[in-house]
Amino acid sequence: EQRAAERMEALVNDPDPTALPQFLTAVPKGGDLHMHLSGAIYAETYMEWARAETLAGTTKYCINNSSLALATSCSSGVSPVPSPGDALFDQVVRAWSMKDFVPGAETGHDHFFATFGKYGAISGSAHHDDCLADVMERAESENQIYLEPMLFSNSTASSKGSDVWQGGTLTTAALPGFHA
């Protein structure tokens, strides 16, 4: 314990500002339990996917100017999905995440839970594999050794839970993507 305290003290006082972050990155982190996969993806990544799909003509995405939510109904009151460096880009990142959040009229709780609906147009799409790969790569770079991702959308999970609660049964056939 004494050696660990001395090592930490030396890192904190090291004149090299990268010493402590490098050490902390190398430390094994344990696990991330009950991680909702859609909420573990950065807003910037969702916007990158939306821009790419729009450019490819797969799905046309836009940003609702008043709610800052991602939309596929792109008529009036919308803007193209912004790119990094655009003023709207930073606004959308703050709306879709806790970045720079300051409590005020909206609580942290309310802001956090409101974010999911803002990027829902793409998070429930065909990007589950991309989401899982993104989270696994980030975990590896942070030396995190265990992930427990939740792969169901809230509606799927709550409908299955409701069925069981009301006396129904749950089988592996009812669980998309479940491998016995």
Please name every model-derived segment.
Residues 1-180:
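Metal-cofactor-binding active-site regions of metalloenzymes
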